[in-house]
Amino acid sequence: YSASETGVDYCVGMLSIDEDADILDPRLWKKERYPVLKTCEKLGIYGPGHNSFTMDEDGNDVMVYHARTEAEINGDPLYNPNRHAMLMKVKWDEAGRPVFSYENK
């Protein structure tokens, strides 16, 4: 999910639930304590959000998301033409949980 308004604090959070749990029971969902994807000034990625998942032609899991390449928003933050579609390969840990990293290429 996306959270924290529209500026550099905009980020992606994650909810998870055990595989055999009742997905309709909101008490069983677990919210990650920290964002799984956030601004990375070093790489010039600001306010990532609105993600979805797909596979590339080689069968690798890929996350598609948008982010800005500038820290400052000019004009209306809800109509900002500086958001760009970006891709990230998603890797998985031993427990089957996604590992999100700008280093995943």
Q: Model-found features: residue ranges?
A:
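Carbohydrate-active catalytic/glycan-binding domains of CAZyme proteins
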Residues: Y1-K105
